[in-house]
């Protein structure tokens, strides 16, 4: 299989929207974005597509992603970012642009300037860590080692930027994902359980993994 890994571009927005939504579902059926937005799947995808091409960068902006492509097209990807310059505060700043383009109002919590309740279980960034996020592969191309190559690539990017540690968060109970990341040197740091998260997502909460670079 002839595989090319490259930086994502604005034209990858439809694929990145699928990737972010799919990564947010992980091993559960209703993902975190569907809970946050409370919209049908197609509307969630439209929202995420616009989110990846906002004027200002943030953790879900296309500039934070690398993708893998084969002759048939783009098949996998993941994000890596500096939480100090591209973290959640920058995401919040970008949201009005997306809602404006969609012609929708923010959900009640965000309209009041508060984060969505479901985000209370998202672990904070480890100080000084390079953060990996939103990992997903098209089903037909899974179990071919593509994510391994992407992970090696994104960890190397963090290493070259001077980071000494990398972090990734997963849903508690997603054992296959945890084992896959452990093969790359990640280890469980802590867990962030939340009954509300369990009710809405179907997972007890989120787990934070870390590795040395």
Predicted features, each with a name:
Residues 25-52, 99-101:
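Conserved GNAT-fold acetyl-CoA-binding loop/helix
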Residues 38-65, 70, 118-122:
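Active-site rim helix/loop that mediates acceptor-substrate recognition in acyltransferases
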Residues 67, 73-82, 131, 136:
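Conserved beta-strand in the GNAT
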Residues 84-129:
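Conserved acyl-donor/pantetheine-binding loop and adjacent beta-alpha core of acyl/acetyltransferases
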Residues 129-130, 158-169:
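Conserved GNAT acetyl-CoA-binding A-motif
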Residues 143-156, 179-183:
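Conserved acetyl-CoA-binding loop-helix of GNAT-fold acetyltransferases
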Residues 164-167, 171-178, 184, 194-213:
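C-terminal "cap" of GNAT-fold acetyltransferases
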């Amino acid at each position: 299989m002839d595989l090319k890994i490259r930086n994502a571009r604005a034209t990858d927005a439809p694929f990145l929207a699928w990737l972010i939504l799919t990564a947010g579902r992980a091993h559960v059926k209703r993902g975190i974005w569907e809970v946050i937005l409370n919209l049908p799947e197609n509307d969630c995808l439209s929202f995420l597509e616009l989110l990846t091409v906002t004027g200002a960068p943030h953790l879900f902006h296309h500039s934070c992603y690398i993708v893998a492509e084969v002759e048939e097209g783009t098949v996998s990807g993941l994000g890596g970012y500096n939480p100090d310059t591209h973290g959640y505060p920058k995401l919040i700043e970008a949201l009005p642009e997306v809602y404006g383009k969609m012609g929708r109002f923010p959900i009640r919590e965000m309209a009041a300037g508060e984060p969505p309740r479901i985000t209370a279980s998202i672990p904070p960034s480890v100080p000084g860590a390079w953060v990996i996020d939103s990992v997903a592969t098209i089903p037909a191309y899974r179990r071919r080692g593509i994510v391994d190559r992407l992970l090696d690539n994104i960890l190397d990017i963090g290493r070259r930027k001077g980071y000494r540690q990398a972090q990734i968060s997963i849903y508690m109970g997603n054992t296959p994902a945890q084992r896959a990341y452990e093969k790359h040197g990640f280890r469980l740091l802590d867990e962030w359980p939340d009954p509300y998260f369990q009710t809405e997502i179907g997972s007890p909460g989120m787990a934070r993994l870390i590795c040395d670079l």
